[in-house]
């Protein structure tokens, strides 16, 4: 876990700042469990009473939450990013779906450009590692795993951009996607030709990043998001056509 001994001062305040910083930088993630009190106090080099004071402060600020019998967790602050009524409205209207994709195209293109310029070698190694997992999983045809790695790949790029506002904003957007608000990614990954195209697009993004070619990285992301939008429109049209065909079949067999 990413905790360091703190400098002597008011220890509880130093603990609060360190944990806040880890949450701000996206290192500690929503719903992640903190180590047990004894272990965490030892790692941070503070007394358990000082740690308790810090945890209490962070709970009162809404950044940490206690689960009875389970421990202390990072609060799911992203869950409150969109009101339930708004997420339901998003889900019911195609306009929101394609605005979401347009937003991602712009933001992730910028993130890729920043990652190529500003990301550390370690940042890019993380991106490479996730892509390697994507490539290895390609032969397994597991749409759930594909969708999970897809999200990890894009988030690794956003993390490598080192903009904490963008990081938390995009995490909130990805949470909506994981919840199936906009569209079902698993359906897209079940199509063989689409899966192959998506893998090659991710390869192009990764290659540009590893070469630190900011412009190509941005363009590769935009090409990828354009493809996702076209695939989704085709998927929706195919679904509408199937509904019409079923109505015709029902009419022919019962008429």
Where in the sequence are the language-model features?
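Short linear motifs at protein or domain termini
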Residues: 1-107, 113, 117, 238-242, ...
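Conserved amphipathic alpha-helical segments that form helical-bundle/coiled-coil interaction surfaces
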Residues: 104-183, 201-207, 216-230, 235
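Extended hydrophobic/aromatic segments used for targeting, binding, or gating
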Residues: 184-188
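Solvent-exposed loop and edge beta-strand segments that line ligand/cofactor-binding
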Residues: 190, 194
């Amino acid at each position: 876990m990413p905790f360091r001994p703190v400098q002597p001062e008011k220890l509880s305040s130093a603990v609060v700042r360190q944990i806040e910083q880890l949450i701000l930088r996206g290192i500690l993630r929503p719903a992640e469990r903190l180590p047990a009190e004894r272990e965490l106090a030892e790692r941070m080099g503070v007394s358990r009473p000082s740690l308790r004071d810090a945890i209490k402060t962070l709970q009162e600020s809404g950044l940490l939450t206690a689960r009875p019998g389970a421990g202390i967790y990072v609060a799911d602050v992203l869950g409150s990013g969109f009101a339930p009524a708004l997420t339901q409205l998003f889900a019911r209207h195609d306009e929101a779906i394609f605005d979401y994709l347009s937003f991602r195209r712009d933001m992730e293109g910028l993130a890729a450009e920043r990652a190529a310029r500003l990301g550390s070698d370690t940042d890019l190694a993380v991106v490479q590692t996730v892509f390697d997992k994507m490539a290895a999983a390609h032969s397994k045809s597991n749409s759930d795993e594909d969708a999970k790695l897809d999200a990890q790949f894009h988030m690794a790029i956003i993390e490598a951009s080192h903009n904490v506002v963008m990081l938390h904003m995009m995490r909130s957007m990805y949470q909506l996607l994981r919840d199936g608000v906009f569209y079902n990614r698993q359906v897209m990954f079940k199509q063989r030709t689409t899966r192959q195209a998506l893998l090659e697009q991710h390869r192009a993004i990764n290659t540009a990043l590893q070469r630190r070619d900011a412009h190509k990285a941005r363009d590769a992301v935009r090409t990828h998001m354009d493809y996702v939008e076209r695939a989704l429109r085709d998927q929706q049209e195919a679904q509408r056509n199937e509904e019409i065909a079923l109505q015709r079949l029902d009419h022919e067999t019962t008429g």
